[in-house]
Amino acid sequence: VPDGRLLPADLLARAYRKAAEDAARTNSLSYRDPRGSPDLRRAIADMLRRQRGLMVSPDHICITRGSQMGVFLTARILIRPGDAVLVERLTYEPAVAAFRACGAKIVTVGLDEDGVDVADVERACRKHRVRAIFVTPHHQFPTTVSMRPDRRLRLLEMARQFGLAVIEDDYDHEFHFGA
């Protein structure tokens, strides 16, 4: 047992008391928006509009504690038992686990040096009742290849044509490293 004299108990008690009083005074102990801080969601929506040209509002943003929670929540909303979810041949396995937990049938599609094989995606969409595709097009995980722009556009066309959701894990878009 550590020597109790080493612990600044009075100092800690004062700090805890002040934090609790401040929280009570500012109503910080009440329930918050489950989607996350409104200020943070507003800042992210602004960044996505400015840097990526996406037309989003803070209401389109939900802050999670990590990509796995985000994928799981998305899967719970979109996937019904028996729906097919397309995943790249090599992919983020925890996402596959989230889709399976929702009763999805996992269908693997090809991947090459230019990203997901869109011809393979189209074949799968014609063969299965596909609800979604999970992709990491910027730096594909785990290969790090980037999907060519023409393939990205074709994937969006197929999403409209077949009514499937594109679930993109853009885990490191803002990271850029020198050669």
Each model region followed by its residue ranges:
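N-terminal basic, amphipathic alpha-helical segments
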Residues: 1-18
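Conserved core of the PLP fold type I
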Residues: 16, 21-163, 173-178
